[in-house]
Each structure stands twice: as C-alpha cells, then as structure tokens.
Amino acid sequence: MTAAFKSEMAQRDRLELNKLRKLLRREVGRAIADFNMIEDGDKVMCCLSGGKDSYAMLDILLNLKKHAPISFEVIAVNLDQKQPGFPEHVLPEYLSSLGVEYYVIERDTYSIVKDKIPEGKTTCGLCSRLRRGILYDFAVEHKCTKIALGHHRDDIMETLFLNMFYGGKMRAMPPKLKSDDGRNIVIRPLAYCREKDIERYAGLREFPIIPCNLCGSQENLQRQNIKMMLQDWDKRFPGRLENMFRAVQNVLPSHLCDTRLYDFDKLERYSMEPEEFNQISVLNL
C-alpha cells in the first residue's frame, strides 16, 4: 500500500467521519427537541457500557453541550458488574482522556445472576432489573435530573417486534419515560439514529469497544432473529424501516383493537330521518 493511497483513504475517512458526526448530531438534537429530553440546568447521567452506542451517545452529547443554547451538565457512569475478563482499565483511561466527570460503580451482579438463574435460562430480566436499580439509586444520590441510555432506532423497532411476536403486546421503547418509582426521568437521545450509522461512526472514531460476555441468553437470541429479519427487509425493501418507524410515531387508536385506548362503547351512528339525509349536499359530507 503506497503512501499516496494511505493518504487518500485517510482523507475519505475524515470526510465520512465529518458527515456522520453532522448527521448524528442533527438526529440527536431533533430527538432532544421533539421530546424535550434535556432542559436548561439539567444534570445528565450518561450510562456507559463500553459498547459502540453508549460511546457515540456520550461523544455527541458532549459535542452538543458546547454549542447548545441551554446550559446542562454531562457525567459518565459505568456499572462494573464483575463479569469475568472485563477490562477495568479501558473506560477510566478513555474518560480521563476526555476530561469528563465520570464514576465507575462496582457491584457483583454477575455472581447474583449466575446463582439465581438456572443454566440455560434467560439472564436478561434479572440482570437488567439489578442494573436498573443500581443506576437509578446512583442518579438520585448524585442529583442527576436525567438518565441517558444508548438505545437507537433499531433497538426501538426490534423491541416492538419482540413484544409483538413473543409477548402479544404492541410495545416498544419510549424516547423518554418516568421510572416506575417516579424518581427518575430516562431519555434515549439516539432514538432517531440508525445502528449502521452509529457503528460506522464508532469505527472511524476508534472507540475502545468492550464486548459483553454475560449475554447470549434466549431473549437475546430472539432479538438477534428479529434484528436479522429487519436487516433483510432493509436490504430488499429500501425505506421500509423508515416507514415502520414513522408508523410508531403516528398511531390511530380508533383503528386498532385496544378498548383501553379508545372508547368504542360511545360510538353512535348519526341519527337522522331519511328526508333530512336527502337534503344534505354530497359535497358537504
């Protein structure tokens, strides 16, 4: 590989990185505005797992913080669950290089999950509940007003189909929600971002990605099947995923079958005598 070729490739990567940064920043900014995710004076706790999504989220939020018309704080928090082989030095070194305020919470949830869940059974439910409780408590203790998670548009659509196929519910991931205990507001700034854009951005930014060794349970295998289905649709039917995501934002309860969302009992036909009906102009109907 010649020096000229290397230089040309580096230039292409720089241009692509700049394009992706602008795209992701625009989509994150749009999501923040649409759902009022971050307000003036907020203290945002950015949950960092070591994966591409949370790295990209932190990177974009720090970038937006410099240019936003409002003032808000960003802190990074990682939960070290004591998984075997977890490289404990990676995140502290990276976050120190950024100069961002960060915390590493050490809790051995790995042993708890392994002790409570039989071999071969899904660990995701218990693991996520333990992780959620620890992070929620930390946010309250440190007076964080928002908890930012790195779920993106693909995660939202996968969750929708996961719940439809296996749970019989039309339920996805909301871009913003109040925790069950009412103490925290959770936001997903990457809600409008495509995973393939985040993945390419993370590669160009050379984030020190940490793989998760605990997962691989049944729920994640089901999610992987749905991910492959959506990826196949994206290749064969361009624009389908975009339309499906728009559908999640454009729900008509009167055209579904949930009596909790729409009061079908109160539907009444228009009461009118035949003579009166004939007098109405068709153009006015």
From Swiss-Prot:
Key words, A-Z: 4Fe-4S, ATP-binding, Cytoplasm, Iron, Iron-sulfur, Magnesium, Metal-binding, Nucleotide-binding, RNA-binding, Transferase, tRNA processing, tRNA-binding
Keyword tRNA-binding included in the entry's annotation: yes
Annotated positions binding [4Fe-4S] cluster: C124, C127, C215
EC number, UniProt record: 2.8.1.-
Extent of motif PP-loop motif: 49-54
Biological process terms in GO annotation: tRNA thio-modification
Superkingdom of origin organism: Bacteria
Xref: InterPro entries: Rossmann-like_a/b/a_fold, TilS/TtcA_N, tRNA_Cyd_32_2_STrfase, tRNA_thiolation_TtcA_Ctu1
Major location category of this protein: cytoplasm
Molecular function per GO: 4 iron, 4 sulfur cluster binding; ATP binding; magnesium ion binding; sulfurtransferase activity; tRNA binding
Cofactor info, note text: Binds 1 [4Fe-4S] cluster per subunit. The cluster is chelated by three Cys residues, the fourth Fe has a free coordination site that may bind a sulfur atom transferred from the persulfide of IscS.
Stored Pfam families: ATP_bind_3
Cofactor entry: Mg(2+); [4Fe-4S] cluster
Keyword ATP-binding annotated: yes
Protein function: Catalyzes the ATP-dependent 2-thiolation of cytidine in position 32 of tRNA, to form 2-thiocytidine (s(2)C32). The sulfur atoms are provided by the cysteine/cysteine desulfurase (IscS) system.
HAMAP family registered for this protein in UniProt: TtcA (MF_01850)
Family that this chain belongs to: Belongs to the TtcA family.
Note: The thiolation reaction likely consists of two steps: a first activation step by ATP to form an adenylated intermediate of the target base of tRNA, and a second nucleophilic substitution step of the sulfur (S) atom supplied by the hydrosulfide attached to the Fe-S cluster.
Protein name: tRNA-cytidine(32) 2-sulfurtransferase
Source species of the chain: Hahella chejuensis (strain KCTC 2396)
Protein encoded by which gene: ttcA
